[in-house]
């Protein structure tokens, strides 16, 4: 399950591990996104949203307590929880970060990062949830921090020290 810590600026921060998710208005972070993708679904009107650490493109269709692990179930659980908190699907927007190609020197590269990105884009398009910003691909891992109360700001810190905001 996700863990809550107090950040250096004394704000509560929820740490989202692989296959985990959280929704609400608290700052959320996901550390060590390689081929995994940090999926943010944000409701700017209500200043709430969710972050999921998506590892694989598709679930087997079986119920799973780690719904955040798969693109299809992560989108579903974030939308479900946000609408239960009063969001309208028509107000939701998405941001994606991660999907790196971490093992490019191996033959038969599975392109998991690319497949994760394609799956999330297709699902969000089908649900008419626009992707307003993305930072995908490359060969360097990322850590993302999502600030729901700050217009859905998403800060991305790459393993090489580069930081940017989307």
From Swiss-Prot:
**Could you tell me which Pfam families the record lists for this protein?**
CheD (PF03975)
Q: Name one GO biological process term.
A: chemotaxis
Q: GO molecular function, one example?
A: protein-glutamine glutaminase activity
| Keyword tags | Chemotaxis, Hydrolase
User: Could you tell me what reaction this enzyme catalyses?
Assistant: L-glutaminyl-[protein] + H2O = L-glutamyl-[protein] + NH4(+)
**Which InterPro entries does the protein's record reference?**
CheD-like_sf, Chemorcpt_Glu_NH3ase_CheD, Cytotoxic_necrot_fac-like_cat
Question: Source organism's superkingdom?
Answer: Archaea
Documented EC number(s): 3.5.1.44
UniProt family annotation: Belongs to the CheD family.
**Could you tell me what this protein does?**
Probably deamidates glutamine residues to glutamate on methyl-accepting chemotaxis receptors (MCPs), playing an important role in chemotaxis.
Q: What is this protein called?
A: Probable chemoreceptor glutamine deamidase CheD
**Gene that produces this protein:** cheD
């Amino acid at each position: 399950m996700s863990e809550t810590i107090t950040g250096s600026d004394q704000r509560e921060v929820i740490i989202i591990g692989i296959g985990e998710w959280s929704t609400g208005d608290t700052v959320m972070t996901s550390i060590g996104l390689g081929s995994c993708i940090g999926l943010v679904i944000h409701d700017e009107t209500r200043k709430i949203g969710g972050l999921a650490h998506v590892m694989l493109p598709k679930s087997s269709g079986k119920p799973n307590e780690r719904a955040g692990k798969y693109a299809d179930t992560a989108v579903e659980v974030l939308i479900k929880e946000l609408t239960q908190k009063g969001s309208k699907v028509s107000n939701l927007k998405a941001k994606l970060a991660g999907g790196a190609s971490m093992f490019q020197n191996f033959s038969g590269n599975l392109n998991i990062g690319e497949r994760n990105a394609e799956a999330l884009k297709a699902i969000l398009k089908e649900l008419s949830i626009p992707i307003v910003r993305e930072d995908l691909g490359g060969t360097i891992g990322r850590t993302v921090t999502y600030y729901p109360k700050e217009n859905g700001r998403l800060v991305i810190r790459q393993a090489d020290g580069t930081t940017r905001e989307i």
